[in-house]
Regions:
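Preference for intrinsically disordered or flexible, low-complexity segments
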Residues: 1-178
């Protein structure tokens, strides 16, 4: 759950939102439904996302008792860190024939849960770059493992979540892991 009103940086694709809540079942984390429509949720989807344009009227419920290994935690926003496309995404911003994009000092991708920036990919560019839709997808968040919260859903990987520019009720996820 991300309170965007407190974030030090909010990607342009999220400026109309105040709060995002992401739900991913740990047993579906490796093969989630790729695109979801939050205007018409599919009950068979393996992940869900709720968005709120304002915090007005929202309340913080008591944490229910359950057997989950997940631990509710209040996270803290870290300072912004500039990041850059890695070798999987370099072709989006430069001529890869002219630059050694494998050089350590060239590609500084932030490998942590974050809003916006460039995806710190594990295997390839996110699949939505090649999706057979008319949508332009903007990466809005990357979710890494969060050991303090008990979330290790992707082993040594991450999930990348994007939002459609043309149809903002469509959201995409790409999960990569080793």
């Amino acid at each position: 759950q991300l309170n965007l009103t407190q974030a030090p940086f909010v990607p342009d694709a999220l400026h109309d939102l105040a709060l995002i809540t992401v739900f991913i079942r740990d047993n579906d984390a490796h093969a989630p439904t790729q695109i979801i429509n939050i205007a018409e949720p599919d009950p068979a989807a393996t992940w869900a996302l709720r968005v709120y344009s304002t915090l007005e009227g929202l309340t913080i419920p008591n944490v229910p008792k359950h057997q989950s290994t997940l631990s509710p935690r209040l996270g803290q926003w870290a300072d912004q860190t500039a990041d850059y496309p890695n070798h999987d995404m370099a072709g989006a911003v430069l001529d890869t024939a002219e630059v050694d994009f494998y050089a350590y000092d060239w590609s500084r991708t932030v490998q942590q849960t974050k809003l916006g920036g460039w995806p710190g990919t594990v295997q390839s560019e996110p699949w939505w770059v090649h999706a057979k839709t008319q949508d332009t997808w903007d990466l809005v968040m990357q979710i890494e493992n969060e050991p303090k919260a008990g979330w290790n859903g992707w082993g040594d990987g991450a999930a990348y979540i994007a939002r459609s520019r043309e149809r903002p009720h469509l959201w995409a996820i790409d999960v990569q892991f080793t």
